[in-house]
Amino acid sequence: MKALILYKSIHHKNTEKIAKTIADELNADIYNIDKVSPDIIENYDLIGFGSGIYFGKHHKSIFKFLDKISKTNKKAFIFSTAGFPFLKSMFHKELRDKLKSKGFEILGEFCCKGYHTYGIFKLFGGLNKNHPNEDDIKKAKEFAKSILKN
């Protein structure tokens, strides 16, 4: 299965670390979603979409990208880094729904802690400093292996 990782990682490159980890495990090509054209997905069977969580959802660039693609029958997975990863189901809902509306089969979802310094958290030195850490990376590898089994 030919895999592609599309991600957006801004402030601390938390999501980029996770994207690279998953890409290594899947032997996937990896791109910042802003650097590719939507027709790139035609060359792949499996596409991972990920970003940090901004105001409760994935970065808007992912949604803009998906708005430009036609309906498909490809497989996908979702990943993110967040200040509050236990809210993954809620954070991923909008992207999950968008992918399903485009015909993607969702194989899994992953979220881990990410260093978060936005807004008031900056005043206190941030939330989840030193994340993603080694344990988060290990869990991302395990997640990628589980995707290969699907």
From Swiss-Prot:
Its domain of life reads Archaea
By its UniProt entry, which Pfam families does this protein fall under? Flavodoxin_5
Q: Which Gene Ontology BP terms does the record give?
A: heme biosynthetic process
Q: Disulfide pairs?
A: none
- Give the matching SUPFAM superfamilies: Flavoproteins (SSF52218)
What InterPro entries does the annotation carry? Flavodoxin/NO_synth, Flavodoxin_dom, Flavoprotein-like_sf, Protoporphyrinogen_IX_DH
Q: Where is the Flavodoxin-like domain?
A: 4-148
Q: Which GO terms describe its molecular function?
A: FMN binding; menaquinone-dependent protoporphyrinogen oxidase activity
Q: What is this protein called?
A: Uncharacterized protein MJ0298
